[in-house]
Amino acid sequence: MKTGLSGKVVLITGASRNIGRATALAFAEEDTRIVLTTRRSKESLDATAAACAELGAKVTTLLCDVTDEDQVGSTVEAAKREFGGVDILVNNATQRVQGPFLKQSPEDWRGAMAVNLDGPYYTSRAVLPGMIESGWGRIINYSGGSAFRGGGATKAAVKLGVVGFTRGLAREFGKNGITVNSIAPGTIEVERDPGLEREADLKGAVDASTPIPRFGRPGEVGALVVYIASDQAAYITGQTFHINGGDYFQ
């Protein structure tokens, strides 16, 4: 499949590991130029960059807290200096909140809102003027299954908020040659932070409820992101792509 992505500039937030890393590698195979960001582990981010460079991609890495509008603006300006602009934005940075609703704190709520909604808001505002000027752009956000079937009020709220945000941008900027879509991954085989669900519990739940009884793979999500960004998907906007092994149907 000819993606038409050669030479495009991709900005991926939360790119140090897991789906972010897999997405970066998928774009590296398409001869794109890549800007990778994370707010914490520069070492892991540099490892992702090195893997992309081995595939022939030109890569730059930056520490960026997506909840800080000034840092986001500086990151996009750095991308302009290095590569001339940003053609594709992948809002992969996320913050998850686990546990019963009444055991969560207001700080948990605000943190989830900041990363999952403020982050895409700031990054989109920073890249859209350049996309409008060039008449071409792709913005890809991350929602999740909880937005559609429940499963944690805080998580469901922010993930459904991403869907609304995506649709609003798609409606407004389609006339400028910009598509905006979101992805709702199911249970993906990733390195999990301490305190999140135990792997064995997740595997049992997936095996019991999912028609394709296994975890999804980060590379499968990365391949979907590349497709959504490609010329082949130029007439698709405002949609949420569910990649969940059939865990639920839309």
Feature names for model-found ranges:
Residues 1, 46-50, 175, 182-210, ...:
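A glycine/serine/threonine-rich, flexible loop-to-helix segment
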Residues 16-18:
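Conserved glycine-rich cofactor-binding loop
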Residues 32-45:
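Conserved glycine-rich Rossmann-like NAD(P)H-binding loop of the short-chain dehydrogenase/reductase
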Residues 100-101, 108-113, 202-206:
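Substrate-binding pocket helix/loop in short-chain dehydrogenase/reductase
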Residues 124, 158-159, 166:
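Active-site helix of classical SDR
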Residues 129, 171-175, 234:
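Alpha-helical segment proximal to the catalytic Tyr-Lys
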Residues 212, 225-226, 237-250:
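Short C-terminal tail/terminal secondary-structure segment
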